[in-house]
Amino acid sequence: MKNLFISGTQVSMLKKTLITTFTFFLSFQSLTEVKELTILHTNDLHAHLFPRIAPWISESRKIGGFANLATLVKQEKQFNPSAILIDAGDYFSGPYLSTLTEGEAVIKSMNYLGIDAACIGNHEFDHGWDNMLEQIKEAEFPILNGNIFYEGPDKLVWDNPYIILEREGLRIGIIGLHG
């Protein structure tokens, strides 16, 4: 197992830098160039691959599950092909199927969603550091992270803390940080 360092100071500094950069970028945009962008966002999926009853919503109707999520994403992308789908992490830990497969079933299911980028959450480490790295290799979408390091602050675990997507003439930066 490798040592893991996540610096809160670095997260704070990065947030300030991002806000400054974003403000600087916006100051050069013409108001006549306004475009609409749809961002679909998931987080804390917690391996709920199958629908379940949520009694606070309905005593009888099942909700959620990856099949329902995939249907919603597909419908939105048919209506709006430039929509972006991102996930903020915590997709491994949850019902028995994730535990039995140590996250493998979750990554395989996520590959069908058409995710543009995802981050790592704390629950991706629930089955161990080495297992998490092994499962993440199977992801068919970019895993982004700019503040998880191998044995010190100089070597990031992932080579890509960010990506830049292009949609309808827009360049969109997506940065991954572990909270």
Give the ranges of each region predicted by the language model:
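N-terminal secretory signal peptides that target proteins for export/translocation
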Residues: 1-13
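Short, linear, compositionally biased motifs with a strong N-terminal bias
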Residues: 10, 23-24
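Intrinsically disordered, low-complexity sequence elements enriched in Ser/Thr/Gly/Pro
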Residues: 13-14, 33
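Sec-dependent signal peptide hydrophobic core
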Residues: 17-22, 57
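Cleavable N-terminal signal peptides
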Residues: 20-21, 30-32
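Acidic, metal/ion-coordinating pockets
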Residues: 31-179
